[in-house]
Structure formats: structure tokens, C-alpha cells
Amino acid sequence: MDLQAIVTDTWNALADERGGGTPARYIPALAAVDPCKFGIALATDDGQVACAGDADEKFSIQSISKVFALALALEREGSALWDAVGREPSGDAFNSIVQLEKEKGIPRNPFINSGAIVTTDRFIGRRGVDEAVRDLIDRLRRMGRNPQIDFDQDVARSESEAGERNRALAWFLADFGRLLNPVEEVLSVYFRQC
């Protein structure tokens, strides 16, 4: 199987779709991203890498980071994590406050914003924000086999400045006793991560 040919053919097949999406407008740094940028990179477990398009461009992984936060939280908490966050589809918006209130502060799953805030809190644990941030970056660099992976400080700042809804979710979680750490500490990691 010619992995590079598959990736290139896929990239070419999607040529007409480039620019069809809309970057998040509520986060100013993301609103400025060129929607025509499109790259594919595929890495196999035996070390093969195939790339096409804008694959060498740095980009913000946004909610993809929630998978890595969940992995770190599960390593620290084990199955006890599922007492703090569910494993069910939400059926509501990714940033719903109403559902969080109805569910008494237990997010439906770790991939909606309230659930990701809880998993971020749990991978921070009691060790502190700086160590948690280093742990997450180290994990992303190892798994991506790329020592250049880092947080985009402009996007993090922009997320924080436009983060009223996520602050509301975090304060709801804190009010229900679901966070171990102060809200602003959890959000300082969450905004860098996501």
C-alpha cells in the first residue's frame, strides 16, 4: 500500500471543499485563520509519515486536545473519573449550561466543554498548573513525535478573553463541588489546551 499516494489522492479529492468551513468567530485569533488552509498528515505506528497540502503549517488543535486531556485524567484517576464526568451523548450544544444544571454538575461526557473542564481539573490534580501544563505538552510532543509542538499563546489569550461561557460552565461545576482546583487555575490550563 502506497500511503503517500492515498494521502495525496485524498487531499486532491477534497480540493473543492477547501475554504468551505468557517473558523470560530467568537475567538478572535481563530477568526483570523485562513479557512483555505488544509493539510493532511498520517503517521503509522511503525514510523511511516505521509503528508499533503499545508501539513507543515502550525495550527491550533482545539477540541482534539480533549482526547489527550482525557487520557491524562484517566491515568491519574482511573475509573473514578467516571464519577465526575459521564460517558453519554449530550444531544445539546457543546457548551450548554442548561444541561449541566439539569445534571447537577456532572457533564454528559469528556468531549463537551464542561466535561473537558472537569478532565482538565483532574489531570491537574493537586500538583499545580505549571507541572500539569508541562505534562500535557510533553505527552503531545511524544505522541506527535515532534518536539516543536507547543501552545499558541495568542490563541490561548484570545480564548481567555472570549471565554465567558466557559467561565460560566466552570463556576457551575465549582458550585456543584465538581472541581478540585480554583476555577481560574483550571481555566488557565483549559484555555491553553483547547
Task: Locate predicted features.
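A short acidic/small-residue loop/turn micro-motif
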Residues: 56-58
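A short, well-structured edge-of-sheet supersecondary motif
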Residues: 15-52
